[in-house]
Structures are given as structure tokens and as C-alpha cells.
Amino acid sequence: MSNLNVTALIGEMAQTKSDSLEILTNIKNIHDVLSASPTNQNLPAEFRKISVPMIYSAWESHFTASIAVCFRALKDINKSANEHSSTIRAIWLQQESFFSKYIDMIKNIYDIDSHKSLSEKMTNMKRKVRKGHFKLTTDVLDSIDTFNSTGLNKQVNVDDLVMTFANVNKVVTEMNMDVIGLDHGSLDLSQLDALVGLRNAFGHGQFTTNVGKRQFLQMLSYADQLVNGLYQEVEVWLSHLDSELKDTHVDSWRCDTPCNISFSHKHI
């Protein structure tokens, strides 16, 4: 029996959408008030500059929360890890202490010899892979077998699974959506890198950059579209996941490639 509560997850995501859209609305309202004021006409222009990071933040906040909701949904499904896609397993595997320990060992072996030639590295590699390393590798393989045959670790903080790399730009957005199985083609990501770039410019003190009123309003509208578009895509994904889980004729809720499922009926 799955512990998936789609209604609660959609409700949680709807709240993050509402919070982000409220920020965008407030930014526009403040700008309208400043623009209507007869005194100090420089204020609207300065406000547009300092608002850019907030406009971007409205997008990032909703994005990270929405992706985390998807991971929470996958965590709540009572399926063994090997019934999930390789990308989902890779995300969860990176959180396992045994895997991190093994990666650290491999990095240790190579980092020590980083200045040496490839032939020297390989020679030293043979010497370094001693009994302890062999034992650790064996333990890791056993642990991976156990990992694959049991459910995804429910103790993992799903917020830590979201890959942001400091900026949620076009590549990062597509990467996270691909991992889960969301259609990033449903979003218009054509202006996202420009928004991130402008946000970073102001974040690094490039205050001479000007943001015109038309550009400002376009950014607000674009961020609004991104937030709503992602919400709709995740809502569809959650609803589809819920439907597949309830379909007793489907052996697994997911397929790496499009599934052609046919059913045979025996008549007695």
C-alpha cells in the first residue's frame, strides 16, 4: 500500500506557488506606487534594480519546493529502488554514507598522484588497492544490492536532493526535470538565463546596469509564467503518478521508455 497523498502534495505546492506569485504582485504594486509619485523620479529606476534578485528568488523558491515535492512523492511510494529509474536511484545513492565513503576512497587514491603521469598512476593504483580497499569495494557492492532491493531511504531530506548549483538557470531546470520525468518542454525557458545573468550582475555589484520599465514588466510577467507553468506540469505529473499507482493492471508506475501494455484474458 502506497503512502502517497497527492492531495496534500498538490496543496503544499499550491501554497509555494501562491507565495511566489504574491511576491511578484507586491513588487509590481510597489513599482506602480513609486512611478505615480511626483517626487524623486529616480526611485522607480532604482527600485527596478533591487527588485531583480527578488523576481528571480520567486522563481527559485517555487522551483526548489516543487522539485522537492516530486522527490517526496517518490519517497512515499512503497516500491524497491530498482523499480525506479536509474536517475532517481543515482540521486538517492549519493545520499548513502557507504557510497560517499567509497567515492572518498577513490578520490584519495587519485588525488595523491595528481602530478604524476598516467602510467605512474596506474602502477601506484595497483599498489594502493590493497586488502582494505578490496574489502571496502566488496562491502559497497553488497550495500548497493541491498539498496536496490529495498525502498528509497525515507530519512533522506528531499530538499537536499534538489540540484541547484547556486543558480536555477535553463540547464539546471532541465536537469532536475529530466531526473524526475517532468517535461521541461512545457515551460518557456528561453529568457531564464538572461534573468539569472541580470540577477548575478546586481548580486556582484554591477549597479550601473539599468533596467527599463518595459524590461522590468516583462521579467515580472515571465517569472509569473514560469511559476504557473511549473505548477501545472508537476500537478499533471502527480495526478498521473497517482492514477498509475491505483491501476491494478500496471505492474510498475513508471517505464524508462513509452510502455505498450496489453492484457490477455482467459475464459474458463
Identify the meaning behind each predicted range.
Residues 1-53, 65-91:
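Charged alpha-helical initiation segments
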Residues 32-33, 104-124, 228-231, 246-257:
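Hydrophobic transmembrane alpha-helix bundles
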Residues 59-66, 70, 74, 206, ...:
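A generic secondary-structure signal for well-formed alpha-helical elements
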